[in-house]
């Protein structure tokens, strides 16, 4: 087993990823509020935490991955009105779109994808307990969390509580005892509502994740809690506060946050009208290009998207996949090597150790390129050592798999192999017109 260390926003230190008493490692990532298609900022955590999950598994961890759907929200109500469909129809539509996005980006399905609407009874019971224990209070059918009861408040975002109060007063609510107190239950007559001891209404966003973690983990606790940097405050801070109130311990051992997205060196925002939907980028460039860009930058650093970044990614991917495809083809049409193949354990171990050091994907990619250099040298030999070539190809495929990238392992049919041999014969016999036509067909079939 290779121990994995990750940067914890709470302690500002690299911490070793642990396990519970059953040797399980729980990873929870805040999922989308499903009222629209995901933009590229929403897609970054999808890819980052998929790479983390693959890394943990490869390093010997038994990972339980949970990522929720927020299918109750004011934005959902407004979007449903705009599209003139029910809230259920709207959320179903965008959950389906998100699942397609996950597939297009080669992201593994979570072990659990809980929805808020499926956990309403548990959410109400959770809030009841907080009210009973004086961690929450009721005002005119609304329920608020009493932040003053949590001495650790501000520890995830590393903010001073007095400074937070000053900022919170800008949007002060006269119902609250404290400007920092946040909504656990909202009384409303708009949109879908649920009966509760306090009013007809719906839950606050910050409560939903805590309850879903409580429902799916043994002790309302995960080893890693992930999300975008923008969720540190108030969302993750408020989740943590409720965990202290409910079970008297932190919600997570490690709070892991990925960096934000810039478009042409400007922050992506609705006001600048520079939002880019992930599905549109995939339609233009493909999911593999997006994953390469994400893997080329450390997960905590911001990523700048521009035409130059995409062009560089395409160029680098050509350097990766052209020799791999050549190797795969030669192994099948010119050798008798059988699958599955062995790998270079030493090189693969170095690759995993790079990722185990706070998901250092840049270093991991440099190790991938070292193996590609070896593969290229083998391809250029007058007499190819097919065992060495096969081992190198398989090692690269293993590395690409951990990065969530496409592997090169197509098995060609006898008919396809014969077409390749026919193309070579045309070239040898200087039948260039026929060779050119057949080459186009081989490219179309993905053989060349």
Regions found by a protein language model. Name each.
Residues 1-33, 50, 121-327:
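Alpha-helical recognition segments enriched in aromatics with Gly/Pro capping
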Residues 11-16, 20-106:
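N-terminal, positively charged nucleic-acid-binding surface of large information/translation enzymes
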Residues 57, 103, 131-132, 256, ...:
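Alpha-helix C-terminal capping/helix-coil junction sites
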Residues 69-73, 95-98, 108-123, 141-150:
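Short, glycine/charge-rich beta-strand/loop segments that flank catalytic centers
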Residues 81-86, 111-117, 199, 228:
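The substrate-binding groove and active-site-proximal loops of carbohydrate-active enzymes
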Residues 267-269, 275-448:
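Structural preference for alpha-helix termini/caps and helix-kink/transition segments
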């Amino acid at each position: 087993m290779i121990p994995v260390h990750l940067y914890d926003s709470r302690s500002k230190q690299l911490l070793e990823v642990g396990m519970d008493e059953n040797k399980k490692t729980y990873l929870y990532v805040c999922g989308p509020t499903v009222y629209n298609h995901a933009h590229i900022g929403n897609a970054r955590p999808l890819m980052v935490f998929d790479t983390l999950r693959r890394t943990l598994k490869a390093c010997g961890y038994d990972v339980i991955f949970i990522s929720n759907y927020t299918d109750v929200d004011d934005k959902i109500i407004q979007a449903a009105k705009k599209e003139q469909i029910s809230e259920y129809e709207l959320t179903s539509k965008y959950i389906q779109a998100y699942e397609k996005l996950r597939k297009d980006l080669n992201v593994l399905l979570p072990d659990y994808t809980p929805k808020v609407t499926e956990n309403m009874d548990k959410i109400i019971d959770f809030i009841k307990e907080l009210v009973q224990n004086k961690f929450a209070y009721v005002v005119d059918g609304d329920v608020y969390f009493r932040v003053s009861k949590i001495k650790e408040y501000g520890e995830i975002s590393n903010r001073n509580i007095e400074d937070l109060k000053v900022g919170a007063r800008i949007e002060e609510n006269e119902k609250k005892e404290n400007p920092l107190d946040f909504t656990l239950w909202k009384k409303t007559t708009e949109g879908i509502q649920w009966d509760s001891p306090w009013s007809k209404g719906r839950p606050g966003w910050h409560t939903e994740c805590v309850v879903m973690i409580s429902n799916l983990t043994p002790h309302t606790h995960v080893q890693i809690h992930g999300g975008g940097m923008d969720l540190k405050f108030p969302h993750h801070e408020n989740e943590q506060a409720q965990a202290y109130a409910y079970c008297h311990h932190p919600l997570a051992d490690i709070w892991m946050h990925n960096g934000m997205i810039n478009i042409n060196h400007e922050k992506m925002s609705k006001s600048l009208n520079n939002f880019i939907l992930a599905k549109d980028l995939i339609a233009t460039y493909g999911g593999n290009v997006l994953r390469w860009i994400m893997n080329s930058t450390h997960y905590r650093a911001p990523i700048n998207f521009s035409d130059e970044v995409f062009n560089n990614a395409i160029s680098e991917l050509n350097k990766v996949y052209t020799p791999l495809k050549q190797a795969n083809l030669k192994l099948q049409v010119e050798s008798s090597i059988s699958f599955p193949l062995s790998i270079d354990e030493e090189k693969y171990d170095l690759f995993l150790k790079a990722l185990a050091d706070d998901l250092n994907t840049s270093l991991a990619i440099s190790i991938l390129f070292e193996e590609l250099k070896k593969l290229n040298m083998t391809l250029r030999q007058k007499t190819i050592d097919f065992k060495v070539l096969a081992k190198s190809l398989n090692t690269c495929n293993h590395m690409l798999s951990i990065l969530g990238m496409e592997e090169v392992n197509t098995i060609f049919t006898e008919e396809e192999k014969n077409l390749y041999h026919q193309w070579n014969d045309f070239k040898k016999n200087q039948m260039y017109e026929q060779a050119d036509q057949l080459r186009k067909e081989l490219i179309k079939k993905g053989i060349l």
